[in-house]
């Protein structure tokens, strides 16, 4: 997995990708509130040579801290969209845990 940064006006969002086939689906893992990318360590370990992968530290979580607390769920979905567009992830399969599930539904 390669760590990358998406810059916003409120702070930086850290995320990790492993793209092995640009034409295949990408498993997009979104941790819940108070969790970070490490929540999905076992899943990433299992899938990393089988699928394209994406995971982030949501705004104001772990590596994505400091981050100004002036955002809502729609902002998170917008930033996720910007990142997926930038990474040219066209076939996301979104797996969200707790608050990550809300972001997935909003996306």
Where are these regions (language model features)?
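Conserved phosphate-coordination/catalytic loops
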Residues: 9, 34, 74
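Short, well-ordered coil/turn elements that cap or connect secondary structure elements
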Residues: 10, 48-50, 89
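Gly/Ala-rich beta-loop-alpha elbow adjacent to hydrolase catalytic centers
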Residues: 96-100, 104
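Active-site signature of alpha/beta-hydrolase-fold catalytic machinery across serine-
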Residues: 42, 106-107
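Aromatic/hydrophobic pocket-lining residues that form π-stacking "cages" and hydrophobic walls in ligand
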Residues: 80, 104-105
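Active-site loop/oxyanion-hole signature of alpha/beta-hydrolase fold enzymes
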Residues: 54-95
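N-terminal cap/lid segment of alpha/beta-hydrolase-fold proteins
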Residues: 1-12
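Conserved HGGG/HGGXW glycine-rich cap/lid loop of the alpha/beta-hydrolase fold
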Residues: 14-66
């Amino acid at each position: 997995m390669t760590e990358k940064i998406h810059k916003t006006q409120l702070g930086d969002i850290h995320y990790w990708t492993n793209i092995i086939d640009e034409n295949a689906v990408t498993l997009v893992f979104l941790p819940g509130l108070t969790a970070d990318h490490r929540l999905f360590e076992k899943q990433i370990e299992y899938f990393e040579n089988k699928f394209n992968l994406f995971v982030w530290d949501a705004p104001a979580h772990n590596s994505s801290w400091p981050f100004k607390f002036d955002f809502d769920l729609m902002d998170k979905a917008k930033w996720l969209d910007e990142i997926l567009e930038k990474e040219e992830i066209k076939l996301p399969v979104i797996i969200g845990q707790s608050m990550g599930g809300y972001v997935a539904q909003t996306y």
